[in-house]
């Protein structure tokens, strides 16, 4: 039989063990919480550092753009457009900055990666492009049958114009209000290219094919020094002529953005691209007479990546900026997006 004096001692021992167990669990949990908070703080610090690296890339690009000495034309072989040693993996502030973009090549070839600033004026502005060119774009690049391309083009014009008159095959409020999830026809300019997906007849498949050659940023004339094969083809030029323009522009090394590139200093210089057939000369003259071609730019896209490389691997943040270059003034920001 146990002595009565041992019971309090046993109780004290049990309580002590319970307290020690509780304190152990508490310490472990506190340690886990502190470690998690430190990791989270470290993560936030890295995100902030990558953000400011990307911001620094934007400023670096703007400075290079404003050093451009060629005021009469803009092309791929200028430093702002393609300068790998300046825009690829530039070490700064404990990280790296990269500015790069892709431009279309000839059919059957992979897109070309360049390090620098993208000329947004080398694209077709869906806010101002005429109906007939819009139809050609949808037919040739969007791979849409002619009749369907005409209807989608008319629906796009109905979406962007300010009136409520419906073009044949187009659409205004009556159509959009009758959808299962109704909305209004905008009757105003497109603000982002993805807005096309709201237009009658436009599908994700068609949009994915045309998105690389369209813009919404007021470039009514296409820069023939930076326009891709697809963009030139969408303007109504023949496939053969588009290929000759690209090769003529690339020079003898057949590379984009190098010293031997040929630069068009006037839209009429297109007439010097080899021997033109009568219909090809007519195609060029038509675009020139409609004031749809240019050789310089004012609107540019900057894709700036802030990159960190350490024991955690490689991580990055990207800022996409579209700006308008202005003489004697700071650039005007037209679009800003942080990934």
Question: Would you name each region that the model predicts?
Answer:
Residues 2, 11-339:
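Compositionally biased linear targeting/interaction segments
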């Amino acid at each position: 039989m146990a002595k009565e004096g041992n019971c309090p001692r046993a109780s004290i021992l049990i309580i002590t063990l319970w307290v020690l167990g509780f304190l152990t669990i508490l310490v472990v949990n506190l340690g886990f919480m502190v470690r998690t908070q430190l990791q989270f703080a470290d993560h936030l610090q890295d995100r902030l550092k990558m953000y400011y690296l990307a911001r620094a890339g934007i400023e670096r690009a703007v400075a290079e753009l404003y050093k451009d000495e060629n005021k009469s034309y803009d092309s791929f072989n200028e430093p702002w457009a393609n300068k790998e040693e300046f825009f690829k993996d530039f070490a700064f502030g404990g990280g790296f900055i990269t500015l790069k973009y892709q431009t279309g090549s000839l059919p059957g070839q992979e897109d070309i990666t360049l390090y620098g600033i993208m000329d947004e004026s080398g694209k077709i502005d869906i806010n101002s492009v005429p109906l007939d060119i819009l139809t050609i774009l949808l037919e040739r690049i969007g791979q849409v049958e002619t009749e369907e391309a005409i209807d989608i083009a008319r629906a796009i014009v109905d979406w962007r114009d300010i009136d409520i008159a419906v073009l044949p095959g187009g659409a205004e409020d009556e159509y959009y209000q009758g959808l299962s999830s109704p909305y209004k026809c905008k009757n105003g300019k497109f603000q982002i290219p993805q807005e096309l997906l709201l237009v009658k007849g436009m599908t994700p498949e068609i949009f994915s094919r045309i998105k690389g050659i369209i813009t919404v940023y007021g470039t009514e004339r296409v820069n023939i020094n930076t326009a891709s094969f697809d963009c030139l083809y969408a303007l109504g030029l023949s496939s053969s002529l588009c290929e000759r323009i690209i090769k003529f522009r690339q020079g003898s090394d057949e590379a984009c953005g190098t010293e031997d590139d040929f630069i068009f200093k006037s839209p009429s210089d297109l007439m010097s691209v080899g021997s033109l057939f009568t219909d090809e000369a007519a195609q060029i003259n038509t675009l020139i007479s409609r004031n749809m071609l240019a050789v310089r730019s004012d609107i540019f896209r900057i894709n700036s990546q802030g990159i960190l490389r350490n024991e955690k691997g490689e991580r990055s943040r990207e800022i996409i900026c579209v700006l308008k270059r202005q003489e004697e003034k700071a650039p005007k920001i037209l679009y800003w997006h942080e990934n």
